Amino acid sequence: MSSELMFNYTFSWPAGPKDVILTGTFDDWRGTLPLVKTAKGNFEITMPVKLANKDDTFQFKFIVDGVWCVSDSYKKEHVSEGIENNFLQITDLVETQEVAGASRIPEAGGLLCGKPPRSAGPPSTSNRKKNKRNNKKRRSKLKKKSTKNNKKSNESLDDNEEEDGVTGTTTEDVTGTSREETPLAEPTNVSKEAPGNFHILPIDQSADTTXSNGIIGGPGPVLVPNPGEIKEFTEIRDVDARELNERLNKKEEVPEPVAGPIVESSVTEKSPALPQADDPIVETKEVAHNVQELTPQVEAVTPLINEPEPLPTPEAQISIPESSKVEPVEGSLQSKLVEKRESTEGVLDGSKKVENKAKKDEEVFTLDPIVNKAPKLPLTDEQTAEGRKSPAVSEEKEKKKKQEKGSKEVKRSETSKEKKPSAKEVKKQTVKASKKQTASPLSSSTEEPKKKKTGFFGKLKKLFK
C-alpha cells in the first residue's frame, strides 16, 4: 500500500471573467484544466488532490483571461521573491469530504455527477395511509351509484374490499406498494472505500455475452477458431502486373480482316454456276447444223449487206433449237416486205429504202434470243391511201386557219365601231374647244398637241372607209 493520500476538492472562482484556468504542481504549471461556468455565473471544478504525506501541500494558481492570479479565498505562500501561490493542506481537504461517496466523471476532471442515491427500503407509512383514504372514497362513490338490481355485484365487491382491507391495500396498488415486489438493495459500506477510488463494476466475459458486447460496441475484429484450415490465410500469390496486362491485352487483340481472301471466296462460290467442260455436249451438233441451213437464206434476203458470219456463243447455242419452228414465218415476212416496197415506191427515196431494208433484215434474221417476238404487220390499202391524201388534208387545215383569222378581224372592227363617239359628243367637244380658245388666246400653242391626240378617231374612220 502506498502512503499517498487522495481527496476530492472543488476549486471555484467568482463570476465576472470570461475564462478561468487552473494550473499547479499537478500539471507542471502548464495551464491544462479550465474551470466550468455554472448557471449562477461563477466557475467551478472538482478534481482529486494527491498528497505524499500529512505534511505535504498542494500548490496551485488561477489564469483569469490570460493573467496569472492568486485567489484571496485560499491560503497563500511566498515561494520566492515576487512569486506567490495558493496552497492546500490536509486539514483543508478533510473538511470537504462530506460528498466523498458521490459519483464522479473522470473525463471531466472528477466533476460530481450527483449525490449517492438513498438506500432502498420499505415504503413509508404516510404513503400507505394516503392510499387507504383514496380507496375509501372510491368505495363510497361506487355504493351511491349502485342500484337494487346490482345487489349481487355489490356483495362481490364488498367481499373483495374486505380482503383488501386485511392486506391494507387494494388490487390496483398491489404492484406499486407491496413489499414483496420491491427488492432490497444490498447495504454498501461507504466508509471502507478510499476517497477518490471509483467503483468499477466487474465485467462478465463469458461465452454468452461476448457476441452481444461486439454488437453494442460496433463491429470488432473476427477471431476464427480454425485459421490454419482457411486457404486465404496460408496461400500467397506473387503476380507480376506487367506480365498479366500483356497476357490479357494479347487475348483482346482481334486480327483485321484482309480483302484478298474474301474476294477469292466469293469467286469460288459463283464459279459452279458456269457451264463445266465435263458436261456432255449433245445439243451443239444440232445447233451447228441449223446455223448452216440459215445462212444461205439470210444472204438471199440481204444481198447488199456483207457481214461476217456470227460465231456460235453459249447463248446462241441454247436459243437456236427454237429457230426450226420460226422458219415458216420467215418466208411470209419476205413476201410482205416485197408488197411494202411496191406500195411505198412513190413516197420514199431510194436511199431510205436501202436503210430500211438493212434494219429490217437485221431485226428479223439476227441470232439473238428475241426471235420469238411477233412480226410487224404490213400496211393496208386504206393506210397507204391516207398517207397519199396527207397533202390535201394540210391544205384544208390552212383554209380553216385563214377563216378563223378573218372572223377575228371582223370582231375587232365591230368592237371599234361600238367605241365610236356619237354626234352629240362630237358637238360638245367642239363647243368646249371654242370656249377655251376665246378664254385664253395665248394657249393656242399648247392646244396643238391636244389636237394631235384627238386625231385617233379620224384614223379609225379612214380605216373603215
UniProtKB/Swiss-Prot annotation:
Residues 160-161 are annotated as: X-DNA-binding. Residues 107-227, 247-276, 298-465 are annotated as: Disordered. Residues 337-363, 385-398, 404-428 have a biased composition (Basic and acidic residues). Gene3D superfamilies: Immunoglobulins. Residues 166-177 have a biased composition (Low complexity). Keywords: DNA-binding, Phosphoprotein. GO terms for cellular component: cytoplasm; nucleotide-activated protein kinase complex; nucleus. One of its GO terms (molecular function) is DNA binding. Residues 127-151, 451-465 have a biased composition (Basic residues). The modification Phosphoserine is found at S153, S156, S271, S319, S343, S394, S440. The modification Phosphothreonine is found at T182, T295, T366. InterPro entries: AMPK1_CBM, CRP1_MDG1_kinase, Ig-like_fold, Ig_E-set. It holds the Pfam family AMPK1_CBM. Belongs to the CRP1/MDG1 family. PANTHER family: 5'-AMP-ACTIVATED PROTEIN KINASE , BETA SUBUNIT, CRUCIFORM DNA-RECOGNIZING PROTEIN 1-RELATED. Cruciform DNA-binding protein which exerts an enhancing effect on the cleavage of cruciform DNA (X-DNA) by endonuclease VII from bacteriophage T4. This is Cruciform DNA-recognizing protein 1. It comes from Saccharomyces cerevisiae (strain VIN 13).
